Amino acid sequence: MAERSLSGLTEEEAVAVHAQFQTTFSAFIVLAAVAHVLVWVWKPWF
């Protein structure tokens, strides 16, 4: 029987989950930055 990590994922599954997380997190950061810039252009807070 193959050994599994504490998360229950194999090494390959963990790498795939991490890659997907990086992609979605990067998209979130870009979207948040764009939203902040648009709000700042509309109504500067300093």
UniProtKB/Swiss-Prot annotation:
Its main location: membrane. The lineage of its organism: Bacteria, Pseudomonadati, Pseudomonadota, Alphaproteobacteria, Rhodospirillales. It comes from Magnetospirillum molischianum. Antenna complexes are light-harvesting systems, which transfer the excitation energy to the reaction centers. Keywords: Antenna complex, Bacteriochlorophyll, Cell inner membrane, Cell membrane, Chlorophyll, Chromophore, Light-harvesting polypeptide, Magnesium, Membrane, Metal-binding, Transmembrane, Transmembrane helix. A bacteriochlorophyll binds at residues 18, 36. This is Light-harvesting protein B-800/850 beta 2 chain. PROSITE patterns: ANTENNA_COMP_BETA (PS00969). The keyword Nucleotide-binding does not apply. The gene is B2. GO terms for molecular function: bacteriochlorophyll binding; electron transporter, transferring electrons within the cyclic electron transport pathway of photosynthesis activity; metal ion binding. It comes from the Bacteria.
